[in-house]
């Protein structure tokens, strides 16, 4: 059998150009989206705005279900089968959050006094010692 040259059909120039053009436009759109980057905030600016928002708000910072589970777990140590009113759990949560916020404020002051902006465990220990809570 003699060899014959097989005829391979190639796409016409028009359709190839159309496909290429569509791909080019899509790539151009993707690049234009990436090239318009938002301006980055200065380091610490986002944290400061977060702090301001949280200081203005009055809602609780700790989630209710995990806090309630923690209270029940701690109460289980002293006496089993204790029941809590929801108002009692809410009062405990308010008091706990007020204590923690105050402690973190004092801890931050200790860090600032040491010419740092990052709080460390030694700052918290010092704050508790100054308060007279150290055991």
From Swiss-Prot:
Q: Which Gene3D superfamilies match?
A: Histone, subunit A
The cross-references to InterPro entries, in alphabetical order and at most eight, read: Histone-fold, Histone_H2A/H2B/H3, Histone_H3/CENP-A
> What SUPFAM superfamilies does UniProt report for this protein, alphabetically?
Histone-fold
Q: Where in the cell is the protein located?
A: Nucleus; Chromosome
What GO annotations for molecular function exist for this entry? DNA binding; protein heterodimerization activity; structural constituent of chromatin
Q: Which SMART domains match?
A: H3
- Which UniProt keywords are given for this protein, alphabetically ordered? Chromosome, DNA-binding, Nucleosome core, Nucleus
Q: Which CDD domains match?
A: HFD_H3
GO CC, one annotated term:
nucleosome
Please give the Pfam families that the UniProt record associates with this protein. Answer: Histone (PF00125)
Known function:
Core component of nucleosome. Nucleosomes wrap and compact DNA into chromatin, limiting DNA accessibility to the cellular machineries which require DNA as a template. Histones thereby play a central role in transcription regulation, DNA repair, DNA replication and chromosomal stability. DNA accessibility is regulated via a complex set of post-translational modifications of histones, also called histone code, and nucleosome remodeling.
Q: How does it assemble?
A: The nucleosome is a histone octamer containing two molecules each of H2A, H2B, H3 and H4 assembled in one H3-H4 heterotetramer and two H2A-H2B heterodimers. The octamer wraps approximately 147 bp of DNA.
Q: Which family does it belong to?
A: Belongs to the histone H3 family.
**What name appears for this protein in its UniProt entry?**
Histone H3
Please tell me the species this chain comes from: Entamoeba histolytica (strain ATCC 30459 / HM-1:IMSS / ABRM)
